[in-house]
């Protein structure tokens, strides 16, 4: 567990922003969902392993918290051993992600079995600590309008094709990220400008304003980094 936390920490340092990974059974609609959420045009095909490499797009929450949305290879039951190494890089995206979005095919009669497979694969990979957001996709194709969402309690009901429910998913992602990342305003007098070089690399600067006494710097960064800075330099570096 500690090793996985360290890997995620290094991944955040490399990307500078949190990572949200779309995972799910093959053909659940992950690539279509990524396209709908980001306005991109990732290749979409109704076949096994249409997505072999991890594809990522940078977007923001309504609160201006940036994150990488990553599309991963679709899982299947009894993945052939010979293919595991080929998929290792994209599977590792799930392990290193800060939040997992599990995309389920609401139009499939085997949704429960497919969901169980995804949960088992995530467990096998060691991706067990991250918060998870359950999604039931293809609500425009449900044969049982009321039944499908009930198979996975608390799941977001949406259609990656039509866009229905996308706003709720964005809100759920933002809620999870706010537990880890948030905008913080630092108040730095002229004699503490040396801290700017330490703060900037930790997150994304969304505003900086010079005053008569120094600089007010607003950065989206991990709560853990904020707490570490406050512990080292005192609460006076925070506005308010």
Regions found by a protein language model. Name each.
Residues 1-39, 109, 120-240:
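C-terminal-of-GTPase-core extension/linker across diverse P-loop GTPases
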Residues 1-100, 104:
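Conserved G1/Walker A P-loop phosphate-binding module
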Residues 46, 112, 163:
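Electropositive phosphate-/nucleotide-binding environments in soluble metabolic enzymes
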Residues 53, 88-91, 116-119, 167-170:
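Generic alpha-helical structural signal
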Residues 73-87, 118, 132, 154-155, ...:
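A beta-strand-loop signature enriched in Asp, Gly, Thr, and Trp
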Residues 78-81, 109-112, 144:
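Conserved D-loop-proximal element of ABC-family nucleotide-binding domains
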Residues 81-85, 113-116, 168, 197:
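Generic recognition of short, well-ordered alpha-helical segments
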Residues 91, 95-98, 106-127:
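A glycine- and small/hydrophobic-rich beta-loop-beta segment
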């Amino acid at each position: 567990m500690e090793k996985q936390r360290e890997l995620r920490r290094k991944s955040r340092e490399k990307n500078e922003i949190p990572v949200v990974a779309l995972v799910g059974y093959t053909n659940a609609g992950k690539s279509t969902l990524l396209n709908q959420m980001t306005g991109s045009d990732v290749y979409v095909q109704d076949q096994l392993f249409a997505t072999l490499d991890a594809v990522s797009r940078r977007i923001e929450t309504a609160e201006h918290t940036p994150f990488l949305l990553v599309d991963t290879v679709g899982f299947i039951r009894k993945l052939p051993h010979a293919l595991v190494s080929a998929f290792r890089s994209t599977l590792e995206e799930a392990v290193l992600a800060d939040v997992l979005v599990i995309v389920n095919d609401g139009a499939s009669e085997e949704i429960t079995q497919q969901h169980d497979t995804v949960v088992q694969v995530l467990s096998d990979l060691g991706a067990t600590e991250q918060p998870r957001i359950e999604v039931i996709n293809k609500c425009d194709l449900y044969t049982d309008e009321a039944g499908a969402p009930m198979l996975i309690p608390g799941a977001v009901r949406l259609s990656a094709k039509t866009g229905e429910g996308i706003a709720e998913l964005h809100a759920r992602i933002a809620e999870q990220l706010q537990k880890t990342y948030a905008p913080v305003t630092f108040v730095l007098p002229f004699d503490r400008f040396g801290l700017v070089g330490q703060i900037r690399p930790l997150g994304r600067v969304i505003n900086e304003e010079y005053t008569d006494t120094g600089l007010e710097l607003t950065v989206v960064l991990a709560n853990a980094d904020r707490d570490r800075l406050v512990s080292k330099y005192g609460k006076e570096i925070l506005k308010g």
